């Protein structure tokens, strides 16, 4: 369960703003009841960590993220300890490097050593990275030992399957969390998009026809596309209220035939055949 909405207004289809504390409690109670055992947060998500600490998160595994390395290693470590304080816990299941570009910073090696010390001291169970592109995943696989990775993945974005990165991560026993399975809500609502998205109208229409033919809702299709991808260990979803989480949980038990998005034609899939 993502928690950015608990600390900030977030998402292209979020019309309600930041989630009220009482609703946060309802969401977490329902999540716990349904076996959702992991919360994803970050110091940069407004006051999300403080909200979670106030409500109580001892029944959940927590994934949080680093602050900017620009302020120095000591400050990043101090911010992590502040996260523990704000969350009202003594350790986290995972700490992700939030800005992947910082691996190129000359201070990064020093930070990574310090994080591994925190892991030895059992303040962190898994160290990992939040990524955005296949190239970043390739770079990490080539250069670092790590336990956990967060990647973008959805029915429109299967680059990590097509490029073999998901399989490579699994071969190294790295835990994979997928975010953006609803593409910030876009995959759930095509009716209220701004002009910026008009260039993809044809693709959106075609996708909606496919979903309609499957007799599933947009939510069911997008969610189960990710859930049926075996290389993914966890799917990260964010909600604004408990009813949305109820819808997601109720939509998560449907088997979906995923062949509808694969086009089995090598002359299309391999550019070497293009003329």
Question: What is the predicted role of each segment?
Answer:
Residues 85-103:
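Active-site groove signature of glycoside hydrolases
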Residues 33-36, 89-92, 124, 146, ...:
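A structural motif
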Residues 16-30, 72-87, 133-139, 222:
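Short, acidic/polar
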Residues 52-61, 81-90, 140-144, 168-171:
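Acidic (Asp/Glu)-rich catalytic clusters
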Residues 9-22, 65-74, 104:
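Active-site mouth loops of central-metabolism enzymes
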Residues 100-268, 274:
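Beta/alpha (TIM)-barrel catalytic core signal, keyed to glycine-rich beta->alpha loops juxtaposed to Asp/Glu
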Residues 59-72, 94-98:
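A short, structured active-site edge motif that brings together acidic residues
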Residues 1-60:
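N-terminal binding-site loop/beta-alpha segment at the start of enzyme catalytic domains
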